[in-house]
Amino acid sequence: SGKSKYIPVTREYLEANHIQGASDTLSILYNQFPQLGLFDGKNMIIGGSIEKLANYPGILSGDISALLIHNMPWYARQAFTPTVDIATAPEWEYKLRETIKQVLQEPIVMFGGVPTWLIVLFRSILEKTGKANLLEIWPRLRLYIHGGVNFAPIKPIFKDLIPSDQFIYQEVYNASE
């Protein structure tokens, strides 16, 4: 409908559906591509925003991507960048600026997030570094996990940002319903 939906999401729901789905996706990818090496570097995920509700202590409100990042298992957090606070920050300019600072210090091998947000982030990174493409910054970049939008019209932009026939684009359906 285009309008924000507020759906109660329990930890059990997140673990049984989204977190298990992420684990299944990585298992399938490693089975198909044993050389993937996703834990040889950092996994960058840019999520939506999250906020604490003043009238409801202990209750968080946010995009499903932000809730997933906030509830990420400890073992996945070890390979995750930027920090949870930055990845789920509500103010876009702050999130962009601080993400760039963090990810330029990391060996990124995989990324996830909304394609249009990532295009803005990646173009800002290229502008800041003066590099021609992302592989000049992160030579071991291997995988983009995406979903939620039609990727076909956007894929050529990513092909320019990551000029490699070996790069893997993995679509997932990560719905909140």
Residue ranges with predicted function:
Residues 1-177:
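Active-site phosphate/ATP/adenylate-binding loop shared across adenylate-forming ligases
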